[in-house]
């Protein structure tokens, strides 16, 4: 790294030399992330169980360090409030005086048992950005459309006035009306369907089509084009490849192709990094920091690369440098790096510094004491400039506008007022979901499931968002997908095999509601052994319905146990509609969330798609775990 080290003191950014002790390096390797629920090994095949464990506990961890569970979805899938659209001013313009007791009052929400949400799903009836996203080529999209509706380019959103004139889609409209024709620009720049006031996330299928159609860009003489392709491949591979390796390991052709493209992308990034391309050095440092793709973790080298990248003008490296220092416990120095990034209008630095201020972490640091309003201003700046690398500013911005962001200081003590603004929150959720934020995708799935924030109920859009979130490891999304396939809807056929598969995935990840649903599915088919097992798993997490069901089973007259059900014997739609009202549906609001518990060992049952499949050496568990540590997106 001599060439990189020589660049450290050239830039006015003034990134200093820094050396880590071996103890510091070990501390930094444990970068904080959302603590997902533990997963047990109820699948008898240890290889399959370990792959599922790696998928949920590694890949689905938050891509942004320090994004804790406090920033996760504030409520369960059924706990969405029923809002009216609010045309209040923007967040920073709305900071006014108010009484302390009125600030951040919790909305009155109802309990969300799995049975209630199933019933609600079956009874539902469908009735600009100011600037381009940073770090993405600003080429004009070349994709064309076959209808006359005005196009909206992904990455740009209509203003509130434009959105008001949008007619929401009829059921025959298709949500994946994308044109995979290569245009030397990533799918984030392509045209999308314009029957929504914001673009839907680009599907995995189209992203893969774009990678295939443009794989020659890796050899492009245009460094920007080649680097954009390499960056996009790493982002897509980070979320999609672990999913394939975990649940579709028989798809060796696609797995091998993505691994090959990932190797090409890493080679190209390393090549440009050695040529002192600032952006390439950032991604190269990221690989060394995380130990991704079988690259041995080297924190000191990552620091050197980040420093050189920052001194060459790539301000996102300042965010990573600050994160490393903050994780080491050196908060004051970390803040200095975040402040430098803020001065360059870096979205990630604005986001992190805003949360430090709003959470009161800097109350004892000079100028930040009792200046929490500045945190709100920084959060809005972060939302305005968010990109696919760090979209978390948008998600936090949405939660603050809904008064759902936990862990913040009492802003009312400073007479700071933030009115609830559901229209702004919806826009921020949608933008974050488009940029790949899994929790935002989960929330948008609920928006279209229940018709919240002024949106209509559109089952297929709900399923689209939930499916995207499920592929990124959101167990609540797997449960929601299972409900849609259990009941079906306009445009969604009943598919009990898929419903069972998604419910089992969420159950294996420790989701208590999914475990209860699994127990109910087996219970209605007379499989007492399996039903008892899953009710017990849910009951361990305090699930009240599961506890009641266990008591009922114990009081029943013992009868011969029927054969274990198979994937073709799941309960039909009529059975689900006859589910009785349970205690949680009449429980008071604000009931504490049911915690997730690991699954131990289930009685034998026929396998679903998660089965033992021989995989080549380079898709082994070792590669998967290291790959899943990559948090590029």
Curated annotation (Swiss-Prot):
Residue stretches of biased makeup (Low complexity): 592-613
Subcellular location: Cytoplasm
Stretches with biased composition (Polar residues): 136-149
Any one of the GO CC terms: cytosol
Keywords for this protein: Cell cycle, Cell division, Cytoplasm, Phosphoprotein, Repeat, Septation
PROSITE patterns noted in UniProt: TPR, TPR_REGION
One of the GO BP terms on file: fungal-type cell wall organization
Role, per record: Involved in septum formation. Required for the proper localization of chs2 at the septum.
Protein name: Chitin synthase regulatory factor 4
């Amino acid at each position: 790294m001599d060439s990189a080290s020589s660049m450290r003191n050239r830039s006015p950014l003034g990134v200093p030399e820094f050396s880590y002790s071996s103890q510091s390096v070990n501390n930094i390797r444990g970068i904080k992330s959302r603590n997902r629920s533990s997963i047990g090994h109820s699948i008898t095949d240890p290889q399959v169980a370990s792959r599922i464990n790696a998928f949920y506990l590694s890949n689905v961890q938050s891509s942004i360090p320090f994004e804790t569970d406090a920033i996760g979805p504030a409520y369960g899938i059924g706990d969405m409030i029923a809002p009216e659209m609010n045309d209040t001013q923007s967040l920073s313009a709305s900071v006014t005086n108010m009484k302390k007791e009125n600030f951040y009052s919790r909305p009155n929400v109802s309990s969300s048992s799995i049975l209630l949400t199933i019933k609600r799903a079956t009874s539902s009836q469908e009735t600009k950005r100011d600037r381009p996203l940073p770090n993405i080529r600003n080429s004009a999209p070349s994709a064309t459309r076959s209808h006359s509706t005005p196009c909206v380019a992904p990455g740009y959103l209509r203003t509130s006035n434009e959105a008001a004139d949008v007619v929401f889609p009829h059921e025959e409209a298709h949500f994946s009306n994308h044109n995979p024709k290569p245009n030397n620009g990533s799918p984030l720049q392509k045209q999308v369907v314009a029957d929504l006031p914001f673009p839907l996330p680009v599907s995995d299928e189209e992203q893969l089509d774009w990678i295939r159609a443009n794989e020659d860009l890796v050899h492009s003489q245009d460094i920007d084009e080649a680097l954009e392709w390499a960056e996009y491949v790493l982002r897509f591979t980070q979320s999609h490849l672990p999913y394939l390796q975990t649940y579709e390991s028989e798809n060796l052709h696609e797995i091998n192709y993505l691994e090959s493209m990932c190797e090409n992308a890493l080679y190209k990034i390393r090549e440009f990094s050695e040529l002192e391309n600032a952006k390439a050095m950032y991604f190269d440092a990221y690989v060394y920091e995380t130990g991704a793709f079988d690259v041995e973790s080297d924190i000191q080298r990552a620091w050197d690369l980040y420093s050189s990248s920052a001194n060459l003008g790539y301000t996102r490296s300042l965010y990573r440098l600050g994160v490393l220092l903050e994780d080491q416990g050196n908060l004051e120095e970390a803040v200095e790096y975040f402040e430098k990034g803020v001065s360059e209008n870096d979205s990630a630095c604005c986001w992190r510094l805003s949360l430090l201020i709003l959470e009161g972490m800097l109350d004892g640091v000079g100028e930040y004491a009792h200046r929490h309003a500045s945190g709100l201003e920084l959060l809005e700046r972060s939302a305005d400039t968010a990109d696919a690398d760090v979209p978390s500013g948008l998600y936090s911005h949405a939660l603050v506008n809904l008064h759902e962001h936990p862990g913040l200081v009492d802003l009312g003590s400073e007479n700071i007022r933030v009115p609830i603004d559901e229209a702004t929150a919806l826009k921020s959720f949608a933008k974050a979901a488009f940029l790949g934020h899994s929790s935002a995708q989960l929330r948008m799935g609920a928006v279209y499931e229940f018709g919240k924030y002024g949106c209509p109920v559109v089952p297929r859009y709900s399923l689209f968002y939930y499916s995207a979130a499920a592929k990124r490891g959101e167990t609540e999304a797997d449960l929601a997908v299972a409900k849609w396939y259990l009941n079906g809807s306009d445009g969604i056929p009943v598919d009990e095999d898929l419903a069972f598969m998604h419910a089992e995935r969420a159950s294996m990840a420790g989701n208590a509601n999914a475990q209860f649903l699994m127990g109910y599915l087996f219970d209605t088919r007379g499989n007492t052994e399996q039903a008892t097992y899953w009710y017990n798993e849910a009951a361990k997490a305090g699930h009240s319905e599961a506890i009641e069901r266990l008591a009922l089973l114990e009081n029943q007259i013992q009868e011969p146990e029927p054969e274990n059900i198979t994937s073709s014997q799941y309960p039909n739609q009529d059975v689900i509609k006859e589910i009785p009202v349970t205690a949680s549906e009449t429980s008071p609001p604000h009931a504490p969330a049911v915690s997730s518990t690991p699954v131990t060992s289930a009685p034998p049952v026929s396998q679903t798609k998660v089965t033992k499949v021989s995989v080549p050496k380079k898709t082994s568990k070792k590669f998967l775990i290291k790959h899943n540590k990559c948090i590029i997106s």
